From Swiss-Prot:
Gene that encodes it: lin-44
Record-linked Gene3D superfamilies: 3.30.2460.20
Secretion signal, residue range per the UniProt entry: 1-21
Protein name: Abnormal cell lineage protein 44
Residue runs in coiled coils: none
InterPro entries: Wnt, Wnt_C, Wnt_CS
Keywords, ordered alphabetically: Developmental protein, Disulfide bond, Extracellular matrix, Glycoprotein, Lipoprotein, Secreted, Signal, Wnt signaling pathway
């Protein structure tokens, strides 16, 4: 698992550094669009855990025919889960142990409110990952045209990559066969809500054309929002998720769930979780609440961190090394009580 995390971090960092740059304004050399090099993991094919995945037959098939698409989707999901863990870091349930949908985690065999978020976030993140890879020119099926034509204003961005990402997410993550149970129905609904989140958060990008930068003509296209923004959008939906019954009337963009969630303190170990011991307002990050009454420990750390970072076009982030003193408070606790959360 440690090696898998390293692989994920490598590609996800590249996503962050280059995705907005390629989606906004194409880098050109003469009349040719200059694309960043394809990461090595997209050239190596699917790893064995995806190639032999038992969770989704579609993953196995796509790994053989379109491995770069599967890997881009997987990495997008991993990035989405990391964003979710950061966004919910002050909540008792924080996404950190939810598991990737492509590995069939226990949480997605239940109909909890938390399950609805992971379904939707996985669907949206997979679409985002593929759309970003398309915009970079890393996936042959949807890469932007290599040539812009005689006039630069003819270039209309990479809008088709967004739809390709949404379609790929649907094909990869939606289970085939009849929807014959409430859980499958809820799963399918939340996956669709995640794909719709991509459309709801699209950003318009425009480029002016004319003498000396005047806007005599303008080319506009749609691009995906940052994954952080998409995650925030879905977390807000999660906070307003609706309990679903046979006669429920819900919007396609709503997140829905089937049953009340268990008490996190009774099913999930909090041992080692970082909390804010100096927080006297007893709100975000409060140790008493996050540690479920198990108490906490405080230790001093001297850590080396990156600082004074500069973005060097394209796509390198150059930073200095700095020393930082930290007081870290972590929850005491017992071993994990459940594999669900």
């Amino acid at each position: 698992m440690r090696a898998l995390y390293f692989r994920t971090t490598t590609l996800s960092t590249f996503f962050i550094l280059c995705s907005l740059a390629s989606n906004d304004i194409p880098r050109t050399g003469g009349n040719k669009i200059v694309q960043p090099p394809k990461p090595n993991i997209l050239k190596q094919g699917c790893p064995s855990d995806l190639l032999h995945s038992r969770a989704l037959r579609s993953i196995q098939l796509a790994c053989r025919s379109h491995p770069a698409t599967v890997i881009s989707a997987f990495e997008g999901i991993q990035e989405g889960l990391q964003n979710c863990a950061n966004r919910l870091r002050f909540q008792q349930w924080d996404c950190s142990e939810a598991g990737n949908i492509m590995h069939d985690p226990p949480l997605l065999r239940q109909g909890f409110r938390e399950s609805s978020l992971i379904w939707a976030l996985s669907s949206a993140s997979a679409a985002w990952g593929v759309a970003t890879a398309c915009a970079q020119g890393w996936i042959d099926d949807c890469a932007c045209n290599n040539h812009m034509g005689q006039n630069e204003y003819e270039f209309g961005g990479c809008t088709h990559g967004v739809q390709h990402g949404i379609t790929a997410s649907r094909k990869l993550l939606t289970k085939v066969g009849a929807v014959n149970s409430l859980l499958r129905k809820v799963e399918k609904h939340n996956l669709k809500a995640g794909r719709l989140a991509i459309k709801k958060t699209l950003i318009s990008s425009c480029k002016c054309h004319g003498v000396s930068g005047s806007c005599q003509q303008k080319t506009c296209w749609k691009r995906t929002a940052t994954l952080e923004h998409i995650t925030d959008y879905l977390v807000e939906k999660y906070a307003r998720a609706k309990l679903y019954t046979d006669d429920s009337v819900v919007k396609t963009t709503d997140l829905i769930y089937l049953e009340a969630s268990p008490d996190v303190c009774k099913v999930k170990s909090v041992a080692g979780r970082v909390c804010a011991w100096r927080n006297e307002t007893h709100t975000q990050g409060d140790c008493d609440r996050l540690c479920c009454g198990n108490g906490f420990s405080i230790r001093h750390e001297v850590v080396r961190v990156k600082c004074d970072c500069e973005f060097v076009w394209c796509c390198n982030l150059v930073c200095k090394d700095c020393i930082q003193h930290r007081w870290i408070s972590t929850c005491n606790g017992t071993p994990p009580k459940s594999l669900i959360f």
